[in-house]
From Swiss-Prot:
GO terms for biological process: 'de novo' IMP biosynthetic process; cobalamin biosynthetic process. It comes from Finegoldia magna (strain ATCC 29328 / DSM 20472 / WAL 2508) (Peptostreptococcus magnus). This is Phosphoribosylaminoimidazole-succinocarboxamide synthase. Belongs to the SAICAR synthetase family. NCBIfam families: purC. InterPro entries: SAICAR_synt/ADE2_N (IPR028923), SAICAR_synt_PurC (IPR033934), SAICAR_synth (IPR001636), SAICAR_synthetase (IPR050089), SAICAR_synthetase_CS (IPR018236). It comes from the Bacteria. Gene3D superfamilies: ATP-grasp fold, B domain, Phosphorylase Kinase, domain 1. PANTHER family: MULTIFUNCTIONAL PROTEIN ADE2, SI:DKEY-6E2.2. Pfam families: SAICAR_synt. Signal peptide: none annotated. Its EC number is 6.3.2.6. The lineage of its organism: Bacteria, Bacillati, Bacillota, Tissierellia, Tissierellales. Pathway: Purine metabolism; IMP biosynthesis via de novo pathway; 5-amino-1-(5-phospho-D-ribosyl)imidazole-4-carboxamide from 5-amino-1-(5-phospho-D-ribosyl)imidazole-4-carboxylate: step 1/2.
Amino acid sequence: MEKLYEGKAKEVYSTEKADEYIIRYKDDATAGNGEKKATIAGKGELNLAITTMIFEMLEKNGIKTHYIETINNTDMRVKKVTIMPLEVIVRNITAGSFAKRYGVEEGRVLNQPTFELSYKDDDLGDPLMCEDHAIALGVITKEEYDYLRKETLKINELLKEFFLKINLKLVDFKIEFGKTDDGQILLADEISPDTCRLWDKDTNKKLDKDIFRRDLGDLTEGYKEVLNRMRG
């Protein structure tokens, strides 16, 4: 296998098949666009296990993803896609940068889910990008924007229901999409406590990367609690 790319939390490798990749989940944790860094033993394995269960659930409910199979504790086989240069962000409850941006308290349930795009560029700080700007700059087409919005809001409903069954509130999350060589758009990357804010429904205890961002305790204990609830 040849390493093709290394990001903050994952590595991408070629395989014997031209249309498949291996994604290796790392134990690295970052926050603030990489300003805060640490290596946390077991984090990659936990994120892979959680992402696997979520992708399998989404596939069963009609969401097309890049997921093929999980090979071992750190590696996932996926369909080859070119990642679109956008992070898609959905918010159900105010928290983090959204609460700070609008001067509202954390924990307020929004009247409806919000759909935001962020342009993926660490040097620019991943700026928010509205529909008009994304289309005008040629980042996506109008048809792609409409598809991303519809698919993402469907994913949100599935995830909210999934987590509510295990007494977790889905506060917000970010996802990424990729395109296959023939132009099909697939949900890619991962869905884990690295990319979602998850709060205990009764206590609002944070069980996500805010544990690391805000120095709230042992990150892996929070992630293990999420995984254990998912496994029942």
